[in-house]
Regions:
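N-terminal type II signal-anchor transmembrane helix
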Residues: 1-54, 62, 94
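Peptidoglycan glycan-strand catalytic modules in the bacterial/periplasmic cell-wall system
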Residues: 48-225
Length: 225
């Protein structure tokens, strides 16, 4: 059912993207399906960049630490429940209820954006899984020396969104919700050069992610970029 709902949405959008309006319905269907089937289904996860430390001759005394992205990946059970609850509540409150793509969310965002088209108040429909996929795409682009902002802007096109949806569905067929949440909490930007909740918790409060309280978790969830 999840894949069927997605296919209907993807087929409609793909037809808009790849087929001129003057061709027949059969040609639209064939071109859309071919284009959709050619989209990738897998995306690499890590290893993520981590800080590099220079030590003194004794091998233990730290002299300096260098990083473009301050990151310290941890397991899900090393992150406080408050933090897990906060990020799900802010980013995707129905994360554990819907599939990789939320048809309800897409419909809600579509209607909202039509109603508020003149005000500029746009609403997104990406699930937490889709956001994780998007972060992985950006991380891979940066590792290739590409610009993160340019990649993010490119990910907002219809074609990029369909690709994101397909990757998200494939991911949920191979990973549990908890595994996806763990990955997301280790890659998401939480202000400045801090990526992932462990690095952010250490940077802002000098504590581990497992010790984050309700207020701290809510603040970090509000910093998600």
């Amino acid at each position: 059912m999840q894949f069927l709902a997605f296919s209907v949405i993807a087929g409609f959008l793909a037809a808009i993207i790849v087929v001129p309006p003057a061709v027949s319905a059969g040609m639209v269907a064939n071109a859309s399906m071919s284009w959709f089937q050619d989209l990738p289904e897998d995306i690499a996860e890590g290893p993520f960049s981590r800080p590099s430390t220079i030590y003194a001759a004794d091998g233990t005394t730290e002299i300096a630490t260098f990083f473009d992205e301050n990151r310290d990946p941890v397991k899900l059970d090393q992150i406080s429940q408050h933090m897990k609850d906060a990020i799900v509540s802010v980013e995707d409150r129905d994360f554990y209820k819907h599939g990789a793509v939320s048809a309800i969310g897409i419909g809600r965002a579509f209607l909202n954006n039509i109603v508020n088209s003149n005000s500029g108040r746009r609403q997104g429909a990406s699930t937490l899984t889709q956001q994780y996929v998007n972060n992985l795409i950006v991380d891979a682009a940066v590792s290739r020396g590409e610009d993160a902002t340019a990649t993010l802007n490119g990910n907002k096109t219809y074609a990029a969104k369909i690709r994101e949806m397909k990757l998200a569905i494939s991911m949920e067929q191979n990973k549990s919700k908890d595994e996806i949440l763990e990955g997301y909490l280790n890659i998401v930007n939480l202000g400045g050069s801090n990526y992932g909740v462990e690095a952010a918790a250490q940077y802002y409060w000098g504590i581990s992610a497992k010790d984050l309280n309700v207020a701290q978790s809510a603040l970090l969830a509000g910093l998600v970029q």
